[in-house]
């Protein structure tokens, strides 16, 4: 019996990965003493553990899926009508040297995110500046007009108050700071393709960008998750689905205004301050 136990101990040392399972077998043996394990027993137990781990991983959602599911109920489509010439030129799409003047544009599309239990919406100021009519559509499909609650042109941040809140309000979860190399996700309505998700990384911090109206936006987050016109005002998210920034524009060497790998967002700490306090 002593040799049997020594052999058992030796096998257990080799298969430490399944020690917990093997230990369970030992505790359930009767008074006749422990049964010696064979190589077949160990191999079968190890395979069972591996199979269960694979099954668990397969059933778990991909991180991008979890990120989207976390933000989707808080996402808002913002439509502006009768935009003025000022609204067109204020959009900081960060082209080089300037973006084309879109004074003739009558309808605009942007993104916003619910930030509190009242249904207030955080977005980019250039999305709504100069608009005569603002309509917001919530995740449940309900739509209502909205009024501007606050604006901060220096940071390109605005807060909208919906005239009628949805029946179920799900405020976004607010995150903290980021560092270069962190995963980054952008969700919005690029080119009218509503509720689109793109993924990338944080590429740089504390960027300063001069926009078309001559002002400078400072302290921006640079990221490479794809964004295009329509993403403005939407959330930049971390790997946990928490809002870490508000998308404000993209850099482009051409006049087309489409994404080439450099996007910018206002940090949520700045956006919260511009909105009158840290979003809850």
Question: What kind of region is each of these model predictions?
Answer:
Residues 51-53, 183, 264-280:
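Interdomain regulatory linker/hinge segments that flank or connect interaction modules
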Residues 8-10, 131-134, 166-169, 187-200, ...:
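Active-site loop architecture of trypsin-fold serine endopeptidases
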Residues 58, 62, 106-109, 175-178, ...:
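Soluble non-cytosolic domains of exported or imported proteins
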Residues 1-44, 66, 111, 147, ...:
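C-terminal recognition in membrane/secretory proteostasis and scaffolding
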Residues 109-111, 116-195:
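Conserved active-site neighborhood of the chymotrypsin/trypsin-like protease fold
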Residues 79, 123-124, 198, 267:
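A secondary-structure boundary/capping signal
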Residues 78-81, 115-117, 125, 149-151, ...:
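Residue-level recognition of beta-strand microenvironments
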Residues 32-121, 129-132, 142-143, 164-167, ...:
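Glycine-biased strand-turn-strand hairpin within the trypsin-fold
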């Amino acid at each position: 019996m002593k040799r049997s136990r020594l052999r058992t101990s030796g096998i257990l040392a080799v298969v430490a990965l399944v020690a917990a399972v093997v230990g369970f077998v030992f505790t359930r043996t009767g008074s006749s003493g422990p049964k010696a394990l064979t190589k077949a027993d160990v191999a079968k137990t190890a395979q069972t553990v591996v199979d269960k781990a694979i099954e668990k991983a397969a059933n778990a959602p991909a991180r991008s899926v979890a990120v989207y599911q976390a933000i989707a109920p808080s996402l808002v489509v913002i439509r502006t009508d009768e935009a003025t010439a000022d609204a067109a030129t204020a959009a900081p799409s960060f082209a080089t040297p300037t973006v084309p003047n879109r004074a003739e544009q009558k309808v605009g599309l942007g993104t916003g995110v619910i930030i509190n239990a009242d249904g207030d919406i955080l977005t980019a100021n250039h999305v709504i500046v100069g608009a005569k009519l603002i309509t917001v559509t919530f995740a449940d499909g309900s739509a209502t007009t909205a009024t501007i609650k606050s604006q901060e042109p220096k940071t390109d941040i605005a807060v909208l108050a919906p005239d009628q809140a949805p029946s179920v309000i799900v405020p976004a979860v607010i995150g903290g700071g980021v560092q270069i190399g962190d995963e980054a996700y952008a969700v919005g309505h690029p080119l009218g393709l509503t509720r689109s998700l793109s993924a990338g990384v944080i590429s740089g911090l504390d960027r300063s960008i001069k926009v078309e109206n001559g002002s400078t936006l400072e302290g921006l987050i640079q990221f490479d998750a794809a964004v295009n016109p329509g993403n403005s005002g939407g959330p930049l998210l971390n790997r946990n689905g928490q809002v870490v920034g508000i998308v404000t524009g993209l850099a482009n060497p051409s006049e087309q205004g489409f994404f080439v790998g450099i996007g910018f967002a206002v940090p949520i700490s700045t956006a919260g301050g511009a909105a009158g306090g840290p979003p809850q």
